[in-house]
Amino acid sequence: SVIELGKMIFQETGKNPATSYGLYGCNCGPGGRRKPKDATDRCCFLHKCCYKKLTDCDPIRDSYSYSWVNKAIVCGGDDPHLKEMCECDKAMAICFRENLDTYDKKKKITLKLSCKKTSEQC
């Protein structure tokens, strides 16, 4: 769910997920996939692609279990669909951490109207 995703992002980056990433670039937050503005925005693009492959779960409401072991996210639980969702969220949180050096505060709130459509496929 959004709650677990937020915790993962905070654990990996130390940033507030809602204010730092909620409307970042063209792909973070609600809406379809657009041409990414930078590496952080690409993390959100890839996350949407990952969610698109999910079946039998609702990424907004369904919750999964994970643990934080030696500063690493470990997805748990028996449900393969929820584990898959956890892996999508884990990948995005790690992607955000790996791209902290190019995070641009000016892109924290991007008007989606300024975003270009992309022909890039998942």
Curated annotation (Swiss-Prot):
Feature type site, description Hydrophobic membrane-disruption site (MDiS): 111
CDD domains in UniProt: PLA2c
Annotated spans, Important for membrane-damaging activities in eukaryotes and bacteria: 105-117
GO molecular function annotations of the record: calcium ion binding; calcium-dependent phospholipase A2 activity; phospholipid binding; toxin activity
Matching InterPro entries: PLipase_A2, PLipase_A2_Asp_AS, PLipase_A2_dom, PLipase_A2_dom_sf, PLipase_A2_His_AS
Keywords (A to Z) from UniProt: Blood coagulation cascade inhibiting toxin, Disulfide bond, Hemostasis impairing toxin, Myotoxin, Secreted, Toxin
PROSITE patterns listed in its UniProt record: PA2_ASP, PA2_HIS
Site (Important residue of the cationic membrane-docking site (MDoS)): 105, 108
SMART domains reported in the protein's UniProt record: PA2c (SM00085)
Disulfide bonds: 26-115, 28-44, 43-95, 49-122, 50-88, 75-86
Keyword Disulfide bond: yes
Pfam family name, one: Phospholip_A2_1
Subcellular location: Secreted
Domain of life: Eukaryota
GO cellular component, one term: extracellular region
Tissue localization of expression: Expressed by the venom gland.
Site (Cationic membrane-docking site (MDoS)): 112, 117
GO BP terms: arachidonate secretion; lipid catabolic process; negative regulation of T cell proliferation; phospholipid metabolic process
Protein task: Snake venom phospholipase A2 homolog that lacks catalytic activity. It shows myotoxic and weak anticoagulant activities. A model of myotoxic mechanism has been proposed: an apo Lys49-PLA2 is activated by the entrance of a hydrophobic molecule (e.g. fatty acid) at the hydrophobic channel of the protein leading to a reorientation of a monomer.
Family as reported in the entry's similarity comment: Belongs to the phospholipase A2 family. Group II subfamily. K49 sub-subfamily.
The name this protein goes by in its record: Basic phospholipase A2 homolog CTs-K49b
